[in-house]
A protein has these predicted regions:
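Extracytoplasmic
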Residues: 43, 55-59, 102-104, 145-147, ...
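N-terminal low-complexity, Pro/Thr-rich disordered segments
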Residues: 1-38, 183-186
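Beta-strand residues in well-ordered beta-sheet regions across diverse protein folds
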Residues: 47, 61-63, 163
Length: 186
């Protein structure tokens, strides 16, 4: 990982107040949320039982159940990606889109008044930061269950909140929040 992520103390951070408003469904991580596509034909149910703390990072495994009319979800990455800036990555670096087009780079944690994106590394070939998460949610994934893995810098605390922002051009589609996710030590 690069200097863009710093190791933080793992003691609980003070509560900084309310979480930012979300435009999608909210539930505890273990209960999960069901998020419909913009057309409403497809939907994905997303759960996360816990995250695991290791050496200043948190590892999470999101369990997703896909329900698609045509037995595949051709745009599965939209439920997990960050497409706020066209042709760039979550850091806003030009050229980052090539490495992250179908990545799960929009899975953020909310802690201590901050939005924490996945940990990343500087890729020598792309010359841009690449997140430590699924990079290719393709080819089309058949209906059923799959696991999405992601690594975040550890903000400290005993629980975390996972938040996925809506894509600006899609309104509230694909937004959701999973709360009260327990942090387990490895």
């Amino acid at each position: 990982p690069t200097g863009g992520t710093t190791t933080k103390n793992t003691t609980p951070a003070p509560n900084s107040g309310k979480l930012p408003e979300t435009k999608g469904p909210v539930a505890k991580g273990t209960e999960g949320v069901t998020v419909k596509s913009d057309g409403g034909d497809d939907h994905v149910t997303i759960t996360i039982d816990h995250v695991t703390r290791q050496s200043g990072y948190l590892l999470g495994q999101l369990h997703t159940t896909i329900s698609a009319k045509k037995n595949s979800a051709p745009n599965l990455h939209l439920w997990f990606s960050d497409k706020e800036a066209v042709l760039s990555n979550s850091r806003g670096e030009d050229g980052g889109e090539e490495a992250t087009t179908y990545a799960a780079d929009g899975l953020t944690l909310l802690a201590g008044g901050e939005r924490i994106y996945p940990a990343d590394y500087l890729d020598a070939d792309f010359k841009t930061h690449v997140p430590l998460t699924e990079l290719a949610l393709t080819p089309f994934i058949k209906a059923g269950t799959t696991t999405i893995c992601v690594v975040w810098p550890d903000p400290g605390g005993d629980t975390v909140t996972l938040d996925h922002l809506p894509a600006a051009h899609l309104g509230s589609s694909f937004a959701y929040r999973l709360t009260d996710i327990p942090v387990k030590n490895s």
